[in-house]
Design a protein with these regions (language model features):
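Short, surface-exposed, charged amphipathic helix/loop patches that serve as local interaction elements
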Residues: 2-281
Length: 281
């Protein structure tokens, strides 16, 4: 999920089949007594309040059917949002019913930052399927394909040390000079959320650089109001671009650490790999 952690994919589209299953599920028929805390938390902008506690339930057969429809379209990040929309039953005092229904709840789920989403998905997988993840890697030394298994409990969770508002200030080393000769250098960058991942991931899978450009246009805002467009990000110096990319990576260095040590049985070398996804298979 490393790629998904840095960039990510598509607009909310609900098929009639999935909507039918969503409407038919009865949350009273499943246990919902599994409580956790997000590493960063949901920031309620209206009230200036940070909410960290949340509650999940175990997945059902209806959930599996609904997610299978999304998986068929090969929409990895949308599966995460859909699974959370269904199985994350409470954030603070908010529930699907209290916020006005599935559409409003879905937007709240999409607004959760990526590391918080990944943390919640890991807990849902642990109680619903199993505590073990299978991951595939290729040895960089000999090219051997390796299948490895990891326990979810073995993955470290790094604490969030950033701002409550989940933004950081930036100051570009060189800055962007517009057609009027005005220099734009400073602004804010926020953490990527589930909607960012949904929109950007398909682009990043095809062209990683374009995915990075799209993600940064969504995350960055100049403090003077000048729009941070794709053309701006293509015209700024590589030094400025790398600065924003690295700042984004630093901001994302919390939550579940998906990097693992992998040993090659063929040549014996040990290398750092990443767990690409948490699936419900």
């Amino acid at each position: 999920m490393n790629e998904a952690k840095e960039f990510n994919e598509a607009v909310e589209e609900k098929t009639d089949g999935v909507k039918e299953v969503l409407d038919s599920i009865d949350d009273n028929n499943v246990d919902s007594d599994l409580e956790y805390e997000f590493p960063a938390g949901y920031y309620d902008k209206e009230n200036g309040k940070l909410i960290k506690d949340f509650e999940i339930r175990e997945m059902t057969g209806a959930d599996e059917e609904a997610l299978a429809g999304v998986a068929k379209k090969n929409k990895g990040a949308k599966i995460i949002n859909k699974a959370l929309e269904r199985c994350l039953v409470r954030i603070g005092n908010m529930t699907e019913k209290s916020v006005g229904g599935i559409d409003a709840w879905g937007k709240i789920i999409q607004s959760l930052c990526v590391p918080d989403q990944d943390f919640a998905i890991a807990q849902i997988q642990k109680v619903s399927v199993e505590d073990e993840i299978e991951s595939s890697h290729v040895c960089p030394e000999c090219g051997q394909k390796i299948r490895t298994f990891f326990k979810l409990d073995e993955l470290e969770v790094e604490p969030y040390r950033g701002e409550t508002e989940q933004v950081e200030l930036f100051e570009l080393p060189r800055g962007y000079k517009d057609k009027k000769g005005v220099l734009h250098k400073s602004g804010v960058i926020r953490l990527p959320n589930g909607l960012d991942r949904e929109i950007v991931l398909p682009v990043a899978k095809t062209n990683l650089s374009k995915g990075t450009t799209l993600m940064l246009t969504r995350l960055c805002t100049f403090d003077d109001g000048y729009p941070m467009t794709e053309s701006v990000l293509r015209e700024i110096s590589l030094k400025d671009r790398r600065y924003l990319e690295n700042l984004n990576k630093e901001m994302l260095s919390f939550g579940i650490d998906l990097s693992v040590d992998v040993e090659c049985n063929n040549c014996g070398s040990v290398f750092k790999g990443s767990i690409n996804s948490l699936s419900f298979q």
